[in-house]
Design a protein with these regions (language model features):
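Short pre-catalytic strand/loop immediately N-terminal to key active-site residues, enriched for Gly-Thr
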Residues: 194-198
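Structured lumen-facing ectodomains of secretory-pathway proteins
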Residues: 1-178, 182, 192
């Protein structure tokens, strides 16, 4: 129906900001270069979650290969792992087998956070994916990480781009459609069952 000449069809563009969960990094609260220590992330589907309010220590373990854990004590700590070379599942399982209680996987290139598809032993501990910038900031210091289910607004890397679910182009009779665009992607709003999401 929206391709009829006399209709006005509306395309969806992505919002300028995204509302996302963040964890806090104790010691980086005043550092504007890394969002004042509030790091956004994408969470993996795991059997457990990070303990709310607990201050976690972490250990940088390179790419998370078996040999990267040599002589490192991860007991009760998080593993800070760089993306690359081996699958996410293997990295996180290696961390678990060396005593880690969770994993922070950071990107090896600039860009949006990825969703990590993991299975097996890797699902036994909580894990999140963070940006290269955040990972490198953690790697260069010794901070504490706290998960408090806090939300924050961030600039969207896909701002003002057509949403992937929105159609656009030329109709079969050569008309340009849609006629106008409006924000419709990455809109944080109320959902069923007293929840929020986008």
């Amino acid at each position: 129906p929206s391709t009829v000449e006399d209709s006005i069809s509306v395309a969806s563009i992505n919002n300028k900001i995204i509302t996302t969960e963040v964890f806090e990094v104790k010691g980086l609260e005043g550092n504007a270069d890394v969002d004042n220590g509030k790091f956004d992330y994408s969470k993996s589907a795991t059997d457990t979650d990070f303990e709310k309010g607990k201050e976690y220590e972490y250990v940088a373990v390179g790419l998370g290969k078996e040999e990267d854990f040599k002589d490192l004590d991860l007991t009760g700590k998080l593993a800070l792992i760089q993306r690359g070379e081996i699958p996410f599942t293997e990295k996180i399982a290696n961390a678990l087998h060396h005593g880690a209680v969770g994993a922070l996987v950071y990107n090896n290139v600039e860009g949006s956070n990825l969703g990590m598809a993991i299975d097996g032993d890797a699902k036994k501990i909580p894990s999140v994916f963070i940006s290269k910038r955040y990972g490198e900031a953690l790697k260069t210091g010794s901070y504490k990480v706290v998960f408090n289910n806090t939300m924050a607004n961030r600039p969207s890397p896909e701002a003002d781009q057509l949403s992937d679910f929105s159609s656009w182009g030329v109709t079969t009779d050569g008309q340009l459609k849609p006629d106008v665009t409006a924000p419709g992607g990455n809109i944080f709003s109320s959902l069923n069952d007293n929840t929020y999401g986008d």
